[in-house]
């Protein structure tokens, strides 16, 4: 969903704006924001579960990277992407490329690392093991990534490089305007944090797909770089160290 505009102030607003006003006594303002915050259709525009997993599926190789960030109402979803997807399917059939050729332990690791880098939804750690299981990896910790490695990578190795809602300022349409998710995926690849040899649904490796897309460099405002990240790491703690008793 594209961000809305507050008709009274002209400021951009979204679903987070509505949440932040939930305790306000100004019922008129709450109603106005609720009606204007989410125009159109689609998923929540920030890096919530949907966009985290949409990015995950792109990086794991099951969707072309350039199709992830455009808004639901973007004309490309009707005028360009359908034919391109048919070409992908034709190529996969012709070359006998199956989902399990694409969704491997290495491509899932890539997608998890990107989820860290975008500060994505913690639900990724519910969905990723099930995706891995469907791909034939029954022991996620041993076959893909252990909890200890995840914590090490997110704390010491992989920074947050996107300033996105709900923790930041921008939405997926802003990421799209700066070149799409392929910008930060390439930056992570160039930094040596991803395996570029994994196969994708385009018939190319991840590195080959990124080379063809040739995304711009991170703009430093919406999309940051590994060298100059938005935040150095993900928060790792327990909000309830003594349990909720």
Which residue stretches match the model-derived regions?
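Single conserved hydrophobic/aromatic residue that forms the stacking wall/gate
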Residues: 236-245
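Short glycine/serine/threonine-rich phosphate/pyrophosphate-binding segments
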Residues: 50-51, 121-128
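Active-site loops and adjacent core secondary-structure elements that bind or stabilize anionic groups
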Residues: 107-113, 129, 202, 216-219, ...
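Terminal amphipathic helices with adjacent charged low-complexity linkers/tails
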Residues: 64-85, 127-171, 176-214
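Solvent-exposed alpha-helices and their adjacent loops that cap or buttress functional pockets
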Residues: 36-37, 48-49, 103-109, 164-167, ...
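Long hydrophobic segments that form regular secondary structure
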Residues: 98, 120-121
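Active-site cavity-forming subdomains of large catalytic enzyme subunits
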Residues: 1-110, 114-115, 132-135
